[in-house]
Design a protein with these regions (language model features):
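OB-fold nucleic-acid-binding modules
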Residues: 1-13
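OB-fold single-stranded nucleic acid-binding module
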Residues: 22-32, 45-48, 52-97
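Structural detector for short beta-strands of small beta-barrel domains
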Residues: 11-27
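Divalent metal-coordination and catalytic microenvironments
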Residues: 17, 62, 166, 247, ...
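Acidic/His-rich, divalent-metal-binding segments that scaffold phosphate/diphosphate chemistry
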Residues: 92-214
Length: 318
C-alpha cells in the first residue's frame, strides 16, 4: 500500500483511502468541485476533484474509495488532485491500514497507568478509580479511544497515551512540590478526560457525537464521576467537590472550555500537565507531518503562530 506519509509532490497515485471529509464547493468562477480529506493510518491529505464530469463515481463520506490522481503542493502542504474515483470493492482494503494507532504498546501503557491506580492511598478515591478501571466495557473503550478529533493524540490509544503522560507529569509535580495532595492530583489526572469516550465516536469516524457537541467532555466526565461517587458509601462531600473542581478547571480558562478557573493548587497543576502534554504532542505531530516538505524550516504553523523546525542533533555541522 502507498501510505499518505510517503506521498511527495509530483507523485502519481492509484490507491484506496478512507474519505474522512467530503464537501461540495465552488470556484470563484462558479464551477462546482469536491474538497475532501482522505485518511490512512499514517495521516491525512487534502484532496480536490476539480472535474466532476468524467470518471468520478458516486461516493459518500466515510466510504473507502480508490482514487487515481497526482500530488501537488498548495501553500506549502501536499494536495492530491483526483482524476478518477470509484468506491473500493470488498477485498481491496484492510481496515487496520486506515486507523491511526499509538506507536506505543496499548497493554504496556495500561499496565503502567494501572500501577498509579493501585498506589492511590485514599480509600474513597481508590474505590472511585476501581469503579471505572474495574469495568471491562469502560476499559475497552478507554484503551481504544483517541484524545481528540485532530489536534493531538487523535489516534487509537491516544486517550490512554495522553492520560498516562499527564499522570506522570503530575507525579513529578508531587515530588517537586510536596504541598500537593498526591492522591487527589493523581486521581484527577487519571480521570480528567474520561468524558472523551462519549464525546468522540469510535474509529474510523472519530468525530464529535451529538452529546459531545452539546455538553463536552469536561462536563460529561464530571457527571460520570458524580454518578460513581453516589454509589460509594461515605464518600466525603468536600473531597468530591475538590475532585470535580479539578476536572472542571483542567483547561484553565473559560475561553478554552473550562466552566471554572483553577481555585485549588491541584487544579492548577493538572491544567499545566494537561497543557504541556497536549502542546508537546501537537508539536511532535506537526514536525512529523511537515517532514514531507523539503528544507530545514517547516513553514508557519497556525497553532504555534510560528515558523517551526526540528532541533539539530549533536555532531551535525552548521
Amino acid at each position: 500500500m502507498r501510505y499518505i506519509n510517503e506521498l511527495r509532490e509530483g507523485d502519481n497515485v492509484s490507491e484506496v483511502y478512507l474519505c474522512k471529509v467530503k464537501n461540495i464547493a465552488k470556484t470563484k468562477a462558479g464551477k462546482t468541485y469536491y474538497s475532501m480529506i482522505l485518511q490512512d493510518k499514517t495521516g491525512v491529505i487534502d484532496t480536490k476533484i476539480w472535474d466532476l464530469n468524467n470518471g468520478i463515481e458516486n461516493f459518500e463520506q466515510m466510504d473507502y474509495i480508490r482514487v487515481e490522481g497526482n500530488v501537488t503542493s498548495f501553500q506549502g502542504s501536499p494536495q492530491l488532485n483526483v482524476r478518477r474515483l470509484r468506491k473500493a470493492r470488498e477485498g481491496e482494503f484492510a481496515m487496520e491500514d486506515y486507523i491511526p494507532c499509538s506507536s506505543k504498546s496499548i497493554d504496556g501503557m495500561f499496565k503502567e497507568l494501572s500501577s498509579y491506580v493501585n498506589h492511590v492511598q485514599n480509600i474513597y478515591l481508590r474505590q472511585l478509580l476501581v469503579a471505572f478501571f474495574g469495568d471491562k466495557e469502560f476499559v475497552a473503550k478507554f484503551k481504544a479511544h483517541s484524545a481528540a478529533k485532530r489536534v493531538h493524540h487523535g489516534f487509537m490509544g491516544g486517550l490512554l497515551e495522553h492520560t498516562l503522560s499527564v499522570t506522570k507529569l503530575c507525579d513529578f509535580y508531587c515530588t517537586q512540590y510536596p504541598v500537593l495532595n498526591k492522591d487527589l492530583l493523581i486521581t484527577s489526572a487519571i480521570c480528567h478526560d474520561i468524558g472523551k469516550i462519549d464525546e468522540l465516536s469510535d474509529f474510523p469516524e472519530n468525530d464529535y457525537t451529538d452529546v459531545g457537541q452539546l455538553v463536552g467532555h469536561i462536563v460529561m466526565g464530571t457527571m460520570m464521576i458524580d454518578e460513581k461517587i453516589r454509589n460509594i458509601n461515605g464518600f466525603p462531600a468536600k473531597l468530591a467537590n475538590e475532585l470535580k473542581h479539578c476536572i472542571l478547571a483542567h483547561h484553565g480558562e473559560l475561553e478554552y472550555g473550562s466552566p471554572k478557573k483553577p481555585a485549588l493548587i491541584e487544579a492548577l497543576a493538572l491544567n499545566f500537565a494537561d497543557n504541556t502534554d497536549a502542546k508537546m504532542e501537537t508539536f511532535i505531530e506537526a514536525l512529523a507531518e511537515e517532514s514531507r516538505q523539503s528544507g530545514e524550516w517547516k513553514g508557519y504553523n497556525k497553532l504555534f503562530e510560528s515558523n517551526i523546525r526540528a532541533t539539530s542533533h549533536l555532531g551535525e555541522k552548521d
